[in-house]
A protein has these predicted regions:
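Hydrophobic core of alpha-helical transmembrane segments in multi-pass integral membrane proteins
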Residues: 25-34, 60-65, 103-111, 136-146, ...
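Generic transmembrane alpha-helix motif of multi-pass integral membrane proteins
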Residues: 231-248, 285
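Short helix-perturbing small/polar motifs within transmembrane alpha-helices
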Residues: 30-33, 110-114, 177-190, 204-208, ...
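Short, strongly hydrophobic alpha-helical membrane anchors
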Residues: 1-18, 78-88, 152-164
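Membrane-helix interface motif
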Residues: 65-81, 144-157, 320-329
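Individual transmembrane alpha-helices with interfacial aromatic-anchor signatures
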Residues: 91-96, 165-169, 335-352
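Interfacial aromatic-anchored transmembrane helix boundaries in multi-pass membrane proteins
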Residues: 149, 153-164, 214-230, 253-289, ...
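Hydrophobic transmembrane alpha-helices
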Residues: 166-239
Length: 378
């Protein structure tokens, strides 16, 4: 019976609680072993911590792959489409497939760049130009497909656009543009060069995969999208703090594309941009204070302030999306008040990340390793 359940469209719902408690137990076991190792064999603790990190990363990578497959099976199934009055044919053709192509192109480009960085550095520049062109074309194709989907299924649906609610397209595009300007403008304060090497790309891949897996370990779900997770943004914020804001914003943008593939409720191209690539690019702002001398000996404070700034920028993106795209969810309430209150869950997520980040930076071994990586990327 369990096997049949796993093979059904409801496999995600069967697997999710099992994975949640398995992951909590796995992490708790690693923490317990680390505590024992630290108090009994301090001379080998650094090596243990490094090995534990890669074991956890491998576990979360497998978990992410399983969750991703099951999530697609659930949200793009005939059953889910029928229950939610979705047109499965257009949903797959105009939302899922273009998003999968974009993610494939982006990830392939990053892998190619990483390999060239290590084995053929002279070929990086022409490859980068071509890869950026292909990725831009794939992103434009996604936006065009979402525009077609909006016109066919959302524009006159009687729900998102009705007598009491409308999707404000111009405001959405302006909100997305202003959010990009805000995030890009803040990256100016990061004086480190925007140059990836094989190591920074490897860490980007590992930490993004860890964030993706942890995003499925939900402490609670919001009714119309969004959730408080088991510190899923911690790996991304740590990456930004160690490797710099510019790299963090770029990795967050790419991570946002991966997150968007899971969501069958992409109703407008600008809403997609605000909630996913731009919203998660904002997470990279966590690194704004990492290279500031005032926080050199107090990384806990620098990381905490950076996390609050990043969470606030992400919050703004979600609020704008809620106000201008999802007015229907407010059901007659003041849409600004509704969106501000609804999206406040972001700060609960950030608070958990800050607690975990402070605990990590209170470890001399972790701080030493992080500082070594930070100096190497100045």
């Amino acid at each position: 019976m369990f096997l049949n359940s796993l093979l059904s469209a409801n496999a995600f719902d069967t697997f999710e609680p099992i994975a949640k408690w398995l992951t909590v137990g796995f992490i708790a076991a690693l923490v317990l072993l680390a505590a024992v190792e630290y108090h009994t064999r301090k001379d080998t603790f650094a090596r243990f911590a490094k090995n534990a990190f890669f074991v956890l990363a491998a576990y979360l990578l497998v978990l992410a792959a399983v969750f991703f497959a099951l999530d697609i099976a659930k949200h793009y199934s005939d059953e889910y489409a029928a229950e939610n009055w979705l047109n499965k044919t257009d949903l797959v053709k105009l939302v899922l497939l273009p998003m999968l192509v974009l993610v494939f192109v982006a990830l392939t480009s990053l892998i190619g760049y990483a390999l060239l960085s290590k084995y053929a550095p002279a070929r990086k520049k022409p490859f980068t130009i071509v890869a950026l062109g292909v990725c831009a074309a794939a992103l434009i194709a996604v936006l065009v497909c979402l525009s077609v989907y909006y016109r066919k299924h959302i524009q006159n649906d009687g729900y998102y656009n009705s007598e009491t609610a409308t999707v404000k397209q111009l405001a959405l595009y302006l909100g997305a543009a202003l959010s990009v300007l805000l995030i890009v403008g803040l990256t100016v304060f990061d004086k480190r060069k925007f140059v990836f090497d094989a190591r920074s790309l490897a860490y980007a891949g590992i930490l993004a995969a860890m964030s993706f897996a942890l995003s499925y370990i939900k402490l609670w779900d919001m009714p119309h999208g969004g959730s408080v997770t088991l510190v899923s943004l911690l790996p991304l914020m740590l990456y930004a703090y160690i490797f710099g804001t510019k790299k963090g914003v770029f990795v967050g943008f790419t991570y946002g594309l991966l997150q968007a593939v899971q969501d069958p409720w992409l109703i407008h191209p600008a809403q997609f941009l605000l909630d996913y690539p731009i919203g998660f690019a904002a997470v990279g702002l966590a690194g704004l204070l990492s290279d500031h001398k005032a926080f050199a000996k107090l990384p806990q404070i620098g990381f905490s302030i950076g996390a609050i700034l990043a969470g606030s920028a992400r919050f703004i993106c979600h609020v704008l999306s809620g106000v201008f795209a999802f007015e229907a969810y407010a059901e007659g309430q003041n849409v600004w008040a509704y969106s501000l209150l609804y999206n406040a869950y972001v700060f609960v997520d950030v608070a958990l990340v800050i607690v975990a980040g402070v605990l990590l930076y209170s470890s001399a071994s972790f701080t030493k390793t992080a500082e070594k990586l930070l100096r190497a990327n100045r």
